Amino acid sequence: MNIRNLGATAFLLFLFSCRPAGCCGDFTEAERTLIRESDSIMRVLTIENAADNMVLRAKSSDLSGKALLSSDYERLAELMVATVTHPSQDGVGIAGPQVGLNRRVVAVQRFDKEPVLCDGKPDHPFEVYPNIHIICMSDSQAYGPEGCLSVPDRSADVLRSQRVVIEYTDMSRLKHLERKYGKGACNYPLPTIRDTVSGFTAVIFQHEIDHLEGILYIDRLQ
């Protein structure tokens, strides 16, 4: 996502339906090759390319514990942040399909958190979320401007929920299991964590998680 401004809105709290997690899998050889052969940033797929569009329109799957504990995942997380923050993109979020991997991984700038130093300048931090799903969405919605790295030179107002509950794999706990059990950590259920997010950051999460379902913001225009 590459629209950085959204007006402040009043937020309410609510109850909603839940979504079960999908199946997990290891990186394929093609995915490992893509990650390992990428330089400092990855190519961003766009709808202007037919082959790219097929990837952008496909649903993404979760990663296994083995994949998440691999150097390939660590490298992927670094590359996704480097790509979305590169001056050629200057985005606020990016999803796996946008860099060629139909995996449920997103990198999101947390405007709801305190700024940190980045290249000597204070800015809101980017964080990477593996196996992410939206569990609950608020009934309260609002329109706001959105753009997309994969839909060049366009923007539009999109109706989004003002608050969401997300669930994703807790990498800190997963790494703790690895330290405790070694490779046996992969035999345990993946530890998860939930987070309630509101405001502009909630909009970014919805936009990026849409990508994991093969949905682009232009599909939501009325």
Q: What are the language-model segments listed below?
A:
Residues C18-Q222:
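Positively charged
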